[in-house]
């Protein structure tokens, strides 16, 4: 989250495991009334979601927002495509990135900032299996170093 503001609602934990995130953007979401109520209740899943640039606009696909319990007939479709609000310069940068081979737009975090739902969108390149193994080895080595350091402290 930029500048440490906002209340974290949902986080895509697999994103950093599956992608090398090179750049992040903060985007607003176009939502219906019952969707924002469900988001505030924390009933959101970013797991399989992704963003696409279509006709000069950015859309978020497969983000699951559970129907609002008191919404009755005004409830929304949980998996509908939602428009992301970004500046024109940012959209043109994203178009340039997505035209390059291997880059994807991955939602990283969903949070509420100043009363509005915001999405942290990352531009990432997919990791191969050996990259993931390498990262796991680095993390394990770091844990070993920290463990040894703590043992010396005692």
Swiss-Prot record:
<dbReference type="GO" id="GO:0003723">
    <property type="term" value="F:RNA binding"/>
</dbReference>
<dbReference type="Pfam" id="PF01668">
    <property type="entry name" value="SmpB"/>
</dbReference>
<comment type="function">
    <text>Required for rescue of stalled ribosomes mediated by trans-translation. Binds to transfer-messenger RNA (tmRNA), required for stable association of tmRNA with ribosomes. tmRNA and SmpB together mimic tRNA shape, replacing the anticodon stem-loop with SmpB. tmRNA is encoded by the ssrA gene; the 2 termini fold to resemble tRNA(Ala) and it encodes a 'tag peptide', a short internal open reading frame. During trans-translation Ala-aminoacylated tmRNA acts like a tRNA, entering the A-site of stalled ribosomes, displacing the stalled mRNA.</text>
</comment>
<dbReference type="InterPro" id="IPR023620">
    <property type="entry name" value="SmpB"/>
</dbReference>
<dbReference type="GO" id="GO:0070929">
    <property type="term" value="P:trans-translation"/>
</dbReference>
<feature type="compositionally biased region" description="Basic and acidic residues">
    <location>
        <begin position="131"/>
        <end position="154"/>
    </location>
</feature>
<dbReference type="GO" id="GO:0005829">
    <property type="term" value="C:cytosol"/>
</dbReference>
<keyword id="KW-0694">RNA-binding</keyword>
<protein>
    <recommendedName>
        <fullName>SsrA-binding protein</fullName>
    </recommendedName>
</protein>
<feature type="region of interest" description="Disordered">
    <location>
        <begin position="126"/>
        <end position="154"/>
    </location>
</feature>
<dbReference type="InterPro" id="IPR000037">
    <property type="entry name" value="SsrA-bd_prot"/>
</dbReference>
<comment type="similarity">
    <text>Belongs to the SmpB family.</text>
</comment>
<dbReference type="InterPro" id="IPR020081">
    <property type="entry name" value="SsrA-bd_prot_CS"/>
</dbReference>
<keyword id="KW-0963">Cytoplasm</keyword>
């Amino acid at each position: 989250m930029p500048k440490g503001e906002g209340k974290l609602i949902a986080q895509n934990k697999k994103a950093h495991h599956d992608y090398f995130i090179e750049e992040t953007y903060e985007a607003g979401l176009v939502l219906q009334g019952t969707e924002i109520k469900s988001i505030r209740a924390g009933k959101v899943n970013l797991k399989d979601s992704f963003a696409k640039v279509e006709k000069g606009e950015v859309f978020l696909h497969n983000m699951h927002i559970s129907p609002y319990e008191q919404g009755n007939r005004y409830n929304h479709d949980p998996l509908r495509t939602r428009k992301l609000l970004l500046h024109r310069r940012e959209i043109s940068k994203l178009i340039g990135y997505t035209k390059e081979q291997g880059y994807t737009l991955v939602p990283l975090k969903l949070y509420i900032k100043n009363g509005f739902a915001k999405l942290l969108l990352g531009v990432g390149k997919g990791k191969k299996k050996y990259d993931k193994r390498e990262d796991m080895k680095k993390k394990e080595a770091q844990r070993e170093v920290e463990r040894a350091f703590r043992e010396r402290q005692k």
